[in-house]
Amino acid sequence: MSKTSRIILWCVLIVVLAMCIVLYAAAKRPAADTTYRDAGKTYAESLQPGDETPVITGGDFTITAHTFENMCTQNRASGMTETVAAQYTLARYIVTRSLYYQAVTDGYAAADAAVQQDIDDTRAAAQTADNREAYEQFIAGTGMTEDAYWASMFETRKLMLTLENYTQAQKAAFLAAGHAPDETDAWHDFCYTLTKAAVDAQNITLAAPYSWTLTRENYNDTGTWPELTQSTGTPG
């Protein structure tokens, strides 16, 4: 796994699949540790109403100050400076949302039934895991019922599964064009071209004082597709 992928897996765990923090950390923390409850509390706080001022505005989506700052907080907690955390958060939201809506437009949206099955499978695995106690502490920390927690994950999992569908289709197109599976640089060039087109189509505007532009130079450092779409239990 690349350095970029490892950073991604750490930075978006709570927002994308908060439970994974619990499952990963459980074997490494004493039972009395409040890590799991704290993680649950942080996740629940991210769902509460907050500052609705737009920070990122695209043709099909808006990221509010509340949502943006929640992600920045997680990035800073992973060791990023304030400036780097903000830039990384801009990159993540701009790229993932732009690609998601492009995927939907192109007909790759994950079916609701498939999303629900994915959630049901993940929930079943969590309930039978060796570290179930940690999972229970996390749920307790959210202040939500299990049903409510998993329901709250629906849109996030729909986004990730849609991106996985899109990635698989584009990988097939890449190979059909005569490329070999191990042509990593060519694959990244291919992905960058599609990503840039998707981002440009959104006509992104950012609130002051933020600025960020996708370039080929920063593409592989921003945690962007295709790394973010790998379905390994902790979506990129």
For the regions a language model picked out, list residue spans one by one.
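N-terminal targeting/tethering segments
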Residues: 38-147
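Generic detector of bulky aromatic hydrophobic side chains
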Residues: 4-6, 96, 117-127, 166, ...
